[in-house]
Amino acid sequence: MLSTSPSRSFKNKFRAAFWPVHNYELGKFIPISALMFCILFNQNILRILKDSILISEISAEIAGFAKVYCVTPVAALFVIIYAKMINHLTFEKIFYYLSAFFISCFILFAFVIYPNIHIFHVHPDTLSDWMNKYPHFKWYISLVGNWGYIVYYSLAELWPNIFYVLLFWQFTNELTTTEEAKRFYTLFSLFGNSSLILVGFLMMNLSSEDTIIKKFISISDSKITLVQVSTTIIAIVAIICCLLVRFISKYIFTNPLFYHKTKSSRSTAQRMGLIKSFKYIVKSKYLWLLLICSAAFGFAINLVEAVWKAKIKELYPTVNTYAEFNSLYILWTGVAIIVMTIIGNNVMRMHNWFVAAVISPVIIMVTGVLFFGLIVFDQQILSLFDGAILMSPLALAVSIGGIQNILAKGTKYSIWDTSREMLYIPLDDELKTKGKAAVDVISAKVGKSSSGLVQSIIFTLVPNATFTSISPILMVVFTFVCFAWIYAVRKIYFEYQKIA
């Protein structure tokens, strides 16, 4: 009887822990990882730009109104359009058409609307007069008067949920088995989210006063140049995404070594009509629990981010300085995601799904309460540690908020995202496609828009309110939502065990 040598045993254990991908699987693993890298690369450039433009050009308070009254209706419309498209078009064509639409809109804003914003927007003095005359409606007036910024922000907000959460993961879930997912998904997260570090360094340079762009072109307005150069990069990377989708569709879906499902199973979801498919989804307790989890994250993180971003604007008031700080934050978020992905990979293998999935809501709740505590009890804390804190209260709030967001996003984009995607794998094709579209696109926006709705109601009723003044209320709501998220994770774990 042959015995396994100690060196071979150690090699197998090392591979299982750090590189559980077989050599013959690299033909599938590398293209999917590259696609995730490119989609997240664009996603994080857009994240930096949308916040820097909207908050610096208008205010932090307007973001909540934009999410409620602009982003959510567009997201709902997209789900309806997508359900129609999937019945008539291949995934490949859907990806091409949506990419062309979004990139065209971003180019139009960067090269036509933004440089000539005074032509397209209501004059600031006129807008200010209207807002002063109707104080309870001033934020709604600002939405309409600054429509260019709002449209750009809305489309940039939709990019992650359409291209990453929906299209990429639907594509990937179709290609991978449950057994492969346990080995691949955390590594996808590791390689894909490393793009945040590259984006951080890139955007820090593009937004700084000593940007490398000055060596090649003359800069008349640094903020417009920042947006135009960034948009050009986004367009190039989007083309690479389309080429990767083409390669995967042509060479991986047709290779029985990489793709193990029958063509008939892939087309099952396309035979049901729109109304019938949505009725099917509504009856699924499983999807409702998934919706609560996704919505809870969007709701909770948006409450913290809203207050934090208002503080950032006070410290960094211009588009470029805001973008430079945001780039540093994105960079460290990338580092946190990579570290937590390595941790999460081992947690998921060594423990059950619930242990891995519950890490995100617990960390977000603990760090969020600490941040709100600093904002609500700032004077008491500063007097208690008088002389020990070497930075201003504003700089301290921005720093603590940054740490909170880095830890929250780090756990969410590494551990929670991969845990959530495993929940879709055992589902049938209808729930896996149209059900995923409804949950992933709508739920995240419902979460953020519900949070924005709470904020918009307060700001409408109390026109002079600020995020600092309403922080005690937001803190209570935030804590309640985090507990609801933890409860939903526990319930869906029991449902997952029944079908996995």
UniProtKB/Swiss-Prot annotation:
GO terms for biological process: nucleobase-containing compound transport. One of its GO terms (molecular function) is ATP binding. It holds the Pfam family TLC. It comes from the Bacteria. The keyword Metal-binding does not apply. GO terms for cellular component: plasma membrane. Keywords: ATP-binding, Cell membrane, Membrane, Nucleotide-binding, Transmembrane, Transmembrane helix, Transport. InterPro entries: ADP_ATP_car_bac_type. It is found in: Cell membrane. The chain crosses the membrane at residues 26-46, 62-82, 94-114, 149-169, 184-204, 224-244, 287-307, 328-348, 357-377, 381-401, 469-489. It is a multi-pass membrane protein. The keyword Protein biosynthesis does not apply. Signal peptide: none annotated. Provides the rickettsial cell with host ATP in exchange for rickettsial ADP. This is an obligate exchange system. This energy acquiring activity is an important component of rickettsial parasitism. Belongs to the ADP/ATP translocase tlc family. This is ADP,ATP carrier protein 5.
